[in-house]
Amino acid sequence: MKLQTTLLGKTYVFRDLKQVLAKANEEKTGDKLARLAAETAQERVAAKVVLAGVTLEELRENPAVPYEEDEVTRLIQDDLNEPQYQRIKGWTVSDLREWILDEGTTGADIRRLSRGLTSEMVAAVCKLMGNLDLIYAANKIRVTAHCNTTIGLPGTLSCRLQPNHTTDDPEGITASLLEGLSFGAGDAVLGLNPVTDSAEQAAKILRRFQEIKEHWHIPTQICVLAHVTAQMKAVEQGAPCDLIFQSIAGSQKGNEAFGFTAKTLEEAKALMLQRGTAEGPNVLYFETGQGSELSSNAHFDTDQVTMEARCYGFARHFAPFLVNTVVGFIGPEYLYDARQVTRAGLEDHFMGKLTGVSMGCDCCYTNHMKADQNDIENLAGLLTLAGCNYFMGIPHGDDIMLNYQTTGFRETAALREITGKTAIPEFQRWLEQMGFVENGHLTKKAGDGSSLLY
């Protein structure tokens, strides 16, 4: 395996594939923090040239974390479809890129072949794509999943209604929930991040969600994003629950820092299929985000895009209903500004869809990042073109509990209006029955949450 190239009379030599992958990555402050990034733009180009000639077999044989040491690697490798892999193992990363972008290659073709790709292959081809490549390629791929309703259908754009509250006050949560529903948010999930991470608090909020859902016959899913073990305990104690949530990482060490293992998720899935309130079969919800592994020193000298791709490979094993990157949540230490956040959002969405998971995006930023609401709206617009399954919906885009900025109720509504997309069909019909939508457009009643009081 020759890992060197000469550009303009200068020879660049790379130590191993891991270094090639890291230095081929677009500029990210997280990679600089980890001392993995290319030192110059010229070195980045050289790494991309070398990576383009690497074969998929070489990438499979050199996972970011050794098979013997890491259950994430083992799940990714063991789940691989061998006939598909054998067909393409001699391809270079450049060959894979050209095949994906070829106008004759369909979304169905990509979905079929993706079962033969490891996460390192997915990350590698992502690094050779420009932003428009990522949009064009992702838009080809359609990934659906079913919980109570089906997300990801052609012509739909969904929204997670996130009615977070600083004290978990049920009435405050309800006010945000009703307002969001009246704007057409919530078809992906009614999902709250609780202040108090306990089974008792999760159960209390889940019961309020279920009460509202049943009273108005709302076709959607409910979830409280406490720790997976707290949610499991709540379900075991009889709380209604459609989805169990967990933040995930791209290494076993990262997941252990989050307080769980693959076995925990297997148990959570089995519990939901036995005692959950959803139809299924997709009953899990995962969130990711570039750089989380570095925070727990669980990145194994691997760049943040490659580790993020491994999150999606890990997620695929559990057939989740929802997966989304929380793209700018960690802050400027890992994604410095709007340009880096935009790039990361497009990368994550493409890698998730290429891996085969139902992919959304929390287009967001922290208040100490060089980004603003316009930048996040730009990213949401680009991801809508890329066929993103869902965004977040928070009152005015300002999460007063988590202290970060994201998309509000109006953004998804506006993007649906611009593109002619709708909510999930059953939810769209509910909006029409309630008078919030007429002939595909929001009515004057939209935004009036008081109309849902009872």
Regions found by a protein language model. Give the residues of each.
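Anaerobic metallocofactor- and corrinoid-dependent redox/one-carbon enzyme cores
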Residues: 1-174, 182, 189-454
